[in-house]
């Protein structure tokens, strides 16, 4: 399968993905391993992976003033790097067309799944995070990096979870 073919396959898989179906459930060894692999792939500090039990607790973690911004910064750096690689491989127009297709495919399914949050603002944040994970995974695939950390992050979301980030020394997974 070509790189852009892999992006198309990702887009086609989005409607059947069980978005947010395992939030609040106990973490499995696989959940912890995926978070650990994702963190390592972005060259971020390791730490214990803590479960988040409720949408209310997820809101608190996401809004915590001690939330570690290095995660966001590492993702932004990687996104710029992968964008350049993908455009070099496929051209700007083909890359943007493929990424737009994935983003559009993600909007409705992620939004509908995130409605489980009783807080409308949190629901929008959750849906946006899931759609962004799709976009980033597509970018990694388009750049020819099928085992990139962004693909791992998408795997976490596709397993029904939401990685909320790092607060203090801990990584939180809903």
Residues covered by each model-derived region:
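Short, glycine-biased loop/turn motifs at secondary-structure junctions and
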Residues: 1-174
């Amino acid at each position: 399968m070509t790189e852009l073919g892999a992006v198309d396959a990702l887009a086609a898989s989005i409607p059947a993905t069980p978005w947010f179906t395992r939030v609040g459930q106990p973490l499995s060894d696989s959940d912890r391993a995926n978070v650990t692999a994702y963190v390592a792939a972005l060259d971020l500090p390791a730490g214990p992976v803590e479960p988040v039990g409720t949408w209310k607790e997820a809101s608190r973690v996401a809004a915590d003033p001690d939330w570690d911004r290095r995660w966001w910064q590492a993702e932004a750096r990687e996104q710029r790097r992968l964008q350049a690689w993908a455009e070099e491989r496929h051209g700007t127009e083909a890359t943007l067309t493929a990424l737009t297709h994935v983003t559009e495919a993600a909007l409705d399914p992620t939004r509908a799944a995130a409605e489980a949050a009783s807080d409308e603002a949190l629901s929008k944040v959750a849906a946006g995070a899931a759609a962004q994970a799709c976009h980033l995974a597509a970018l990694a695939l388009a750049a020819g990096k099928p085992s990139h950390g962004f693909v791992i992050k998408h795997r976490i979301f596709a397993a029904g979870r939401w990685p909320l980030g790092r607060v203090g020394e801990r990584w939180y997974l809903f």
